[in-house]
Amino acid sequence: MKAGPAISIGQHSEAGRKERNDDSYGVVVPDAALLEAKGIAMAIADGMSSSEAAKIASETCVKTFLEDYYATHPSWTVKTSVGRVLSAINRWLHGQGAANHLSDRGMVTTFSGLVLKSATAYIFHAGDSRIYLLRSGAIEQLTRDHRVRISREREYLSRAVGIDTN
């Protein structure tokens, strides 16, 4: 059996400018059968700190993504599997935010996910959590922040999970 590439996984989280850290992250390296069928899945999410449910939103997003991705049909592509899982998570978070009247921010979180399957890296991203590649001592940002600048002092997220029904 041919050996695959050597992969090292690292995760880092910090609160940043806010006191509270609403980040959640995780990785699943499954057994051999699932590894071949679905690959390795990783995710990081950062709940919108202006929401009282920020940490719940990020934890739910990461946990559900990692569990539900591996429960999708084996014949589905990575894109189909992740698309359906993230769509369901988005609808659920949006619905929970609306049903529970969680201020004006709802249950909203950024999300960056990566699936490594065979020799391909699939990236799924909404918001400003980032995925980087570190190779041969050089670091490269693989995602682009979804932020809109209003002025020098003000900007906002233009995309996030749970922010709307799409």
Language model features with spans:
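PP2C/PPM-type serine/threonine phosphatase catalytic domain
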Residues: 1-166
